[in-house]
Amino acid sequence: MRALLMAGLVFGLATAASAQTADLKVGDQAPNFKLQATDGKTYQLSDFKGKHAVVLAWFPAAFTRGCTIECKSLAENGDKIKMYDMNYFMISVDPIEKNTEFAKATSVTLGQGANAQVVEKKEADFPILSDPTKETAKAYGVLMEQGFATRWTFYIGKDGKILAIDKTVKPATSAEDMAAKLGELKVDPATRP
């Protein structure tokens, strides 16, 4: 019975993910957004058009295992990504207060009791965007039925069009994988400090 319930849950999650894919695909214009970030600024995708590529790394929830590991990878290996002429953001449907606390955390305790594990990480040196209304998540097709975003990364060109969508993000190697994808997509090298 337990196996049947687990199979149902996995199927349900897979179905929810596919049901929420919107119709975005490579070559489509990326939906604009105007969202608050953990650095105190508000970012709008249209502000980057004609200037820089943009990478949006959607994640389910701050302070969870995979999201903490992904943030750690991006904070510790961000120099690999910064070799390219683009701006990158992590983004979730968490409120700005929670994402700000997450960005500043240098250690996160995952699990409870005897199974608790402390993950040490650097403070995020990049903005984390908050989409508490979930409108941007819906526009990008990442909102799950459970109310959180799925872990997908969108690569957006200077022209505002989607260059690639990574639906198989590996949190531990997120920065390295992102840098490799930017190279593969032939995103211009960085010309600014």
Say what each PLM segment does:
Residues 44-68, 72-74:
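Short active-site neighborhood of thiol/selenol oxidoreductases, capturing the structured segment around
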Residues 4-14:
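Bacterial N-terminal signal peptides
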Residues 148-193:
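Thiol-/selenol-based redox modules, centered on thioredoxin-like
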Residues 68-122, 134-138:
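Structural microenvironment flanking redox-active thiols in thiol-disulfide oxidoreductases
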Residues 123-127, 145-154:
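Structural micro-motif
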Residues 39-41, 133, 159:
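Residue-level recognition of short loop/turn positions
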Residues 18-46:
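N-terminal "domain-start" segment that seeds a small globular fold
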Residues 46-48, 142, 168:
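Residue-level structural signal for beta-strand termini and adjacent loop
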